[in-house]
Amino acid sequence: MEEKKGQRIVVQSLIGTKQLPFYLKCLKSLIQFSKDKFDLHLHSDGSLSQSDEDFIHAEIKDTEVTISNSKLNADHVLDCLSGKPNCQRFRKESIWGIEFFEPLFLDEKDPVSYYLDADIIFLQPFSGLFNRSKTENGAIFLKDTQWDAYCLKPLDFIGKH
């Protein structure tokens, strides 16, 4: 993984209190199996309490973790979307609006945003997933550097009935 002029990579994700233990399990697997170092920034759907945030910081110890203030972040993103009423409406009315816009405006000085869904569990070591040189001419979505990812449904863990 490359860092831009000593700048740490920041990987962002959206979480909420409803599935918090599962999200943390997945995010800890990301940290555990990534050979590359990064900071983690968590956006909230607005449901996180102070005790949830304390729990997050107690659980994730191997990387720097920051958590957005949902209200302040929403106001900032809506300001950034000034003059784009459809985008503002989408941001206000949909969880997908949070997921789509908030990572883009976290650091306006950094043109690259790394975003990962919080419900992806990693099962083996990997490197190079967050590589600035691969984003020079646009964006990469759903990147799998090894082409051997697996999709498992919850019932796969229970067995056949």
Regions found by a protein language model. Name each.
Residues 95, 99-145:
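GT-A fold catalytic core of metal-dependent nucleotide-sugar glycosyltransferases
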Residues 35-39, 64-68, 91-93, 129, ...:
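Glycine-rich loops and low-complexity Gly/Arg-rich segments
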Residues 140-160:
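A short, conserved beta-to-alpha structural element at the edge of catalytic cores
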Residues 36-38, 42, 56-59, 87-89, ...:
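N-terminal, helix-rich and Lys/Arg-enriched segments in bacterial and organellar proteins
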Residues 57-109:
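Active-site-proximal specificity loops/subdomain of glycosyltransferases
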Residues 1-80:
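N-terminal anchoring/stem segment of glycosyltransferases
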Residues 26-27, 55-57, 128-131, 155-156:
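Short, glycine/charged-enriched secondary-structure capping and boundary segments
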Residues 41-46, 71-74, 99, 135-136, ...:
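Short C-terminal domain-edge/linker segments immediately following a structured domain
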